Amino acid sequence: MRIVVLAGGLSMERNVSLSSGTRICRALRARGHQAALVDLFLGLEGYDGAPESIFDAPDGLCGDFSVAREEPDLDAVRASRRDKSENIFGKDVLRVCAMADVVFIALHGACGEDGRVQAAFDLLGIPYTGSGYLGSAIAMDKDLTKRLVAPYVTTAKWRALKYTADEIDAIADETELPCVVKPNANGSSIGVTIAHTRGEVAAALTECLHFGAQVVIEQYIHGRELQVGILDGKALPAIEIIPKTGFYDYANKYQAGAAEEVCPAPIPAEWEEKLRSATETVFRVLELSVYSRADFIVTEDGTPYFLEINTLPGMTPTSLVPQEAAAAGIGYGELCERIVTSSLRARKEGRA
């Protein structure tokens, strides 16, 4: 198949996406597909051949890419674009996507995981992988997700609010501690703070203003961090995350050796079943499709507290879903190919 692996874009998770996309593209090419990596925002800038020739490029336009410890400089990315346009679709992106049999969406965060790209592809009749635009948009909104799933699964107490800089001190004064402060629509734990003091709450709220005016302030739950991938609507083995320092933030997620990841997780069968049930319930309630990954904190008594679900989980060398798939006997190349074939089937059957 001709496959465009769409990555990059203008999200704070740009670098993670490019790492995922590079690995996905190489895996699909190794399985005989004509796969090519395309940056959503920059498109085919710098490529001298005809757009349709990317599928025959010897390397699929895949360079060597690893995730830096620091978040990307998006201003520099914008400045590097030759036409200086803010259009999320770069040069020839829609053109080559329309030529493909399917687009593997390897985007993370805004302009990719939030449903906007999926909606555009639906309008243009371009087949793509993963959940549709509505489920993607809902899952990106942490507050809306929790409101929809709270009747069915256990989740930490939370409140969502929009605020200005002038309101930060008052909000900090009335916040129950300890708590977790996070942007309402970010991924990769970017902007997330565990706050134990009023000052830490205020600092976290100040930082979150860089990511939009809405935050979620969540009750801090002490427990073990477990995550569960899902493929074709069925949960994969749970994985436990044990950061060597701090919590599972951006740096700990994407730097090899920064966290211990144990899969299958060393937990009782009863815990595994509760996690499986909760993950599949959230997936079903939000009407997601093909694959995703849900995040939980499990307390000492075995209660799983649902945190959020990611419709386009990372596929980097340190990412969790590939590890969980491997524990279920599914290799990385097979996982990528199953996502493609399951997505095409789901769209044909009207399930995505």
Predicted features by range, described:
Residues 196-277, 298-305:
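Phosphate-binding site of ATP-dependent enzymes
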Residues 1-134, 138-140, 144, 148, ...:
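ATP-binding N-terminal substructure of ATP-dependent carboxylate-amine bond-forming enzymes
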